[in-house]
From Swiss-Prot:
GO terms for molecular function: arginine-tRNA ligase activity; ATP binding. Coiled coil: none annotated. This is Arginine--tRNA ligase. Belongs to the class-I aminoacyl-tRNA synthetase family. It is found in: Cytoplasm. It comes from the Bacteria. Keywords: Aminoacyl-tRNA synthetase, ATP-binding, Cytoplasm, Ligase, Nucleotide-binding, Protein biosynthesis. Monomer.
Amino acid sequence: MNIFDLYLDKIIILIKKLNKDGSLELPESLNGVNVDIPPSNFDCDISTNVAMVLSKANKKSPIDIANILIELIKNEDEKIESISAAKPGFINIKFKTIYWNNFIKSINQNHKDYGVNNKEKKQKYLIEFVSANPTGPLHVGHCRGAILGDVISNILIFNKHDVSKEYYVNDYGNQILNFTKSVFFRIREILFNEKFPIENSDLYPGDYLVGIAKNIIKSNKVLKFDKFENVSKELTLLSVSESLKLIKNNLSNLGIVHDRFTSETDIVLNNEVQKAIDKLKEKKLVYSGKIKAPKGEDDENWVEREQLLFKSTDFGDDKDRALQKSDKSWTYFASDVAYHDNKLNRNYDTLINILGADHAGYIKRITSVVEALSGDKKKLICKVSQLVKLIKDGKPFKMSKRKGDYITVEDLIAEVGKDATRFIMLNRSSDVELDFDFTKVKEKSKDNPLYYVQYCYARISSVFRHVNLNIENDLNIKDYEFAYTGDEIKILKKIAEWPKCIEAASLRLEPHRIPVYLYELSSEFHSYWNMGKEDQSKRFINEQKKISNDKLVFLKVISNVIKSGMDIVGVDTPQKM
């Protein structure tokens, strides 16, 4: 039950009725009409801008239109306690208690689907996220994007969309060659006591390579490690496979499971790069040309070479992009073109890419080529996961993958746990940098958002245990009378915002809205709980050690929303803390 959508429908029906009898003119579109959450300083439950939308078409001020509508709206609904106009033309509505009685009955009966946005057209989504090079375990920079992609998937699944989660394995090119060489030298170090060439800056010096090397030795799939050239092909496959095992384990410990891993090597060897480029050629979007020196590059040192270029400027990019170098080898971008063509061939309605902050500049070229191949400007949506700053002992902790002293996902989980990692990483918009403070995430206070929300659920669970009920079971209470006051209704109004939160999180792909909402709801509940220390009427367990049915239903509704939100975020709701 989305009270905002229900009331919007009522208002639209009313103004169309007024238009039909000649009392009111309508604009070309009513899409601008909304029913929303009023500011906290207004004593009302919902607010609508309908008068402002109708003002121009009727050549009257919004306040005049509002004054015409308020009596008509009130006459249409006996559950309205008060209705008023406020500048510049809002109509504010406050409901009688009976409205909230019906509201809580409705969502208690249909709690599993409460919040689902039935207005959204159901689609098939392919979400690609993480896609870190398979050259070692995941670090904190990957962690935020991984959680972002996973929770966006959960939100879309909650709204009944068909979602596939994919990891693109960049297992082709020089980085993989250098990674495999690093493993080779670690194997030589173990078998023949040869010193690892640490001075070679192209190699990966991390200690995790020792574990990968030992596993490859134990597999007995390569028997001789005399020269790298003799074993490079088989060793590359084994090294990438072992690295992916580490990555999949990292993701599993974060609560993330991908549906598919797509290999860049497979894309290249299946000649998909050439096929994708041929499609662009057919559209006359490829030509041979030269690229000028990039900004900041010395023109004197830049050598212009004839290359195969994609006309990405036709789609708003700042320059055309190279697909094939002068030596006829494909660029990294060409492989990406082929991969996205591969995605398009699988007939998804919408593609979503979660990119790290270092790939933000890559967005325009890849959205351009997807538009070129699909003819749909909105086919691909890219979300950027900004940097994470780790704070330890009051100081920033820096990481460097090349030096091998970076903080891994495993380090983070070992320090604060899976739940804290997921919740805190999601607690701010992905568009801004995040400070991850190790001290705060361990506190048992309102400064720790995860603890505050989990404690809300645990407190409610304690009341259910007191009356020998399992909070996870449905309540079979049919005969109950409501006696809610303004303090309870304040919480119910917050509960009423849940569908709006889900709608915004889904349409804008902004999952941080979920933990922010859960924290606000929990804060309202904790405040109410604390009132019971002074006010007997606010206590859930009365002097006779019993709880009224209306309070029990009230608690159940709160706990259902908390549980639903925490499931989307992917964290536990403990019944005891």
